[in-house]
Design a protein with these regions (language model features):
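PLP-dependent amino-acid enzyme catalytic core
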Residues: 6, 14, 19-385
Length: 385
């Protein structure tokens, strides 16, 4: 059982049911679409594609039980732990290549004093928590590209409400075989974030400000991905499209690691006992970071409540309180632009799990959201939302 709540736990939404997590290492993981109109593919293919042909998001076909194994190795370094977690999902990359990708992403990139019980994720090169994933993504994509013998250049299309943009640009800058294009809303990011992006150096980077908000940028990127004829034309010209947003499973999986690392750190410091549940508060915009914690829970990590924190654009907290996801509201520009979002892409992955992985129901709900702006979802048969 996992509970999602808003603010100071004034509401708790319980997601019940048997986890589909019988895998315990060894076999290579396959990935399926949340909308069910595409067959299972390998992790390397899912990383390269970013988004499924049917418009759905890739999810693992099952969740590996790793906590019982990893709790015996609580003294692992972050790099060692990252390998133990990520290999369960991206096993087809191969041990040597995966370890190399992890080492290139994290070795010497982060420095933080351990003084409190916050996961301080802003100590990477761009001061964004997304460095933890976006330093890894280019490395794992390079390995996936080689594994699938892809000769075309890969164009990374990314929409940002602030920190993803700089982190993606930094991660992919001057990486051979890749180009990165970042769309951001003019007047919708902080002055520092805009300056970080437009001054990014690199022979393969492009930054474009749009008239509109983040949701406009994100929906535009999704439309490009959904244009089959356009993508085919690009392929004929030697280019493939992919994404660095958290819709890409290659972005999401490495974020699971720091929840395991944080939990083991609390045990090692004797602040909790092994097996004690912890509650995790996550400021939430596109629902990727909190979803990574949820995935950690499904892998056995002792998590009690996941607390969804929001700003004035509280579409997610309204959803958790009422069950209605109503995006038909005006976007408010706040001092936390990375959370100025009305359409949270990763919620689709939660809806998929909460509806017992019923792809048809998930597609119906997402179509309803896109067409009408409102949807009502049943979460694992527990209650109507």
């Amino acid at each position: 059982m996992v509970k999602f709540s808003y603010g100071n736990s004034c509401f708790k939404m319980e997601i019940k049911g048997e986890y589909i997590n019988k895998k315990v290492g060894g076999a290579k993981m396959n990935f399926i679409s949340t909308r069910g109109e595409e067959g299972a593919i390998s992790s390397s293919e899912a990383i390269i594609k970013g988004i499924a042909n049917d418009g759905g998001l890739y999810v693992p076909n099952e969740f590996p039980e790793v906590y019982d194994r990893l709790k015996k190795k609580m003294g692992l370094s972050y790099i060692e732990l990252a390998y133990e977690v990520i290999k369960e999902f991206f096993g087809d990359i191969g041990e040597e290549n995966l370890k190399g990708a992890i080492d290139r992403a994290y070795n010497g990139k982060f420095s933080v004093r351990e003084e409190n019980d916050f996961l301080e994720l802003y100590h990477g090169p761009t001061s964004a928590f997304k460095d933890a994933a976006l330093l890894f993504l280019p490395q794992i994509m390079k390995e996936a590209k080689k594994l699938n013998n892809i000769k075309e250049e890969i164009v990374i299309l990314t929409a940002t409400s602030g920190d993803t943009g700089k982190a993606a640009l930094q991660g992919f800058s001057n990486v051979d075989g890749f180009k990165v294009v970042v769309y951001y809303p003019e007047n919708g990011v902080s002055a520092i974030q805009e300056k970080q992006m437009v001054t990014q150096e690199g022979n393969n980077v492009k930054v474009i400000g749009i008239r509109g908000n983040f949701d406009n940028a994100q929906s535009g990127v999704k439309k490009i991905f959904g244009d089959v004829e356009f993508r085919e034309e690009l392929k004929n010209r030697g280019f493939l499209l992919s994404s660095a947003n958290s819709i890409n499973i290659g972005r999401l999986v490495p974020q699971i690691v720091y929840y395991f690392y944080g939990y083991f750190d609390l045990v090692n410091k004797q602040k909790i006992k092994e097996g004690d549940e912890i509650n995790i508060v996550v400021p939430t915009g596109n629902f990727g970071n909190i979803l990574a914690a949820y995935y950690g829970k499904k892998m056995g990590l002792p998590i009690g409540k996941l607390i969804c924190s929001s700003n004035e654009n509280n579409v997610l907290t309204d959803f958790l309180n009422t069950g209605l996801y109503d995006r038909r509201r005006e976007l408010i520009l706040t001092e936390s632009p990375s959370m100025d979002i009305l359409v949270s892409s990763n919620l689709e992955r939660l809806i998929f799990e909460a509806n017992n992985r019923d792809a048809k129901k998930t597609k119906k709900l997402m179509d309803e959201l896109n067409e009408k702006g409102v949807k009502v979802a049943r979460l694992a048969g527990n209650r109507d939302l």
